[in-house]
């Protein structure tokens, strides 16, 4: 994923959120409903990291697990998930199924 696509994904979460929940899905099968966001913030990624495409993340909270993942690769801490370069979802939708963003391979 290039930096432009990564930032687009972050801004879709940040810009869309108007109080309506969003559904986020990961490749491990985890599917959650999120009711709030922290906004975009700087993270600890460094330019020398092999998978560096940016130093920004977004936190989603008030997380309700709709489907459990098949591993623990996505951490839910204090009812929140940090979406960052090491934790990129596969798909983001509205509750009605309208796709807001989908990962390109």
Place the predicted regions along the sequence by residue.
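Conserved RNA-binding domains used in RNP assembly and mRNA/RNA metabolism
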Residues: 2-21, 25-27, 31-105
């Amino acid at each position: 994923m290039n930096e432009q696509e990564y930032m687009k994904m972050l801004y879709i979460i940040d810009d869309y959120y108007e109080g309506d929940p969003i559904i986020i899905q990961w490749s491990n099968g985890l599917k959650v409903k999120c009711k709030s966001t922290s906004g975009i913030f700087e993270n600890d990624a460094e330019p020398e990291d092999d998978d560096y495409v940016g130093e920004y993340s977004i936190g989603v909270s008030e997380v309700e697990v709709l489907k459990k993942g098949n591993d623990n690769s996505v951490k839910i801490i204090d009812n929140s998930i940090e979406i960052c370069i090491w934790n990129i979802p596969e798909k983001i939708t509205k509750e009605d199924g309208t796709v807001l963003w989908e990962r390109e391979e």
